[in-house]
Amino acid sequence: DGIKILDGLQRSYTIRDVVLDYESGKVPAEDGNPLNNLVRVEIYTGINKLGILYRMLTLNTGQTRMTTRHQIEIIYSDYKTNCQVPGVNLISEVDGNIPRKLGDYHFRDVIEGFTSYIQEDFLTMDRLDILDNVKDLERLAKVTKEDNPFDDFLAAYHHFVCKMKSSFGGELNVEDMKLSSNPYALTAVGIFNKSQSMTGFGNAVSSLKSLGVIGSFKDVDSAIDEISEHTVEDGLYRIVSCLDSLREMAKKIGNDQRLYFYRFFRRLLDKEGAEFGNVDAAAEKAYNDYLRETR
């Protein structure tokens, strides 16, 4: 129990082919039995999952690069079936289910949000590899100081979604909103159970930590507790309206939505800002921020 064997199989298959060639006579006998050569094996004890990931990245130089998403999915694949966050159900792509209920999230989306937290970038899935940017490794080193950053990230985000759901548990009535197309979502859960909001949240939390505004996920939980409930319903309507307007201007709709949610959470969770704890005000200011950054 507790042992992880990391093998990309490239070298293993190469060694197997060399041995088979030797045994079949394809390799001259004078070259010697390849199994007589030494094979280097490294064993690490007392190391956490992110420490393993860090070594996978730094020791993988020169090999075919994995995507950032693949790197982290390898380490956190066990969360698909053994999530430790109460009230959360992680859905894998092969399940074919759509997250609809409170606590249901696509595992892929949570991974993207967590990666945004690590890299302090809501566009993380466009990156080929964490090694492309040394700063990403520095951020990775910072989060390893926490006991279980994946659980902490997911628990904080789920806490936020629960706060939104408890403040407004109904369905938005958008008939009089004159939207240009179908609404982004009609419920609090529907708005915040997608990758766009999770990556925005991850990026915002990481940025606020870098600025020294928050120190840990306990501070994030505290900030969420202070969100004014009477601002939630109007805030959800405003988010849907802003995302509808954004859709007509966006060059890359998904990326622009991520930018909007990043700005939203930066405003909402910043205790030093005027919009702190006010969902409606944060949603409005986030749209203004979006316009300034994209025009």
Give the residues covered by each predicted segment:
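A short, basic-hydrophobic beta/loop patch
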Residues: 1-54
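Conserved aromatic-histidine-acidic binding/catalytic patches
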Residues: 2-7, 185-193, 253
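Enrichment for repetitive, rod-forming helical segments
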Residues: 17-18, 115, 265
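Solvent-exposed functional surfaces
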Residues: 24, 37-41, 49-246, 259, ...
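Charge-dense, extended regions
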Residues: 234-295
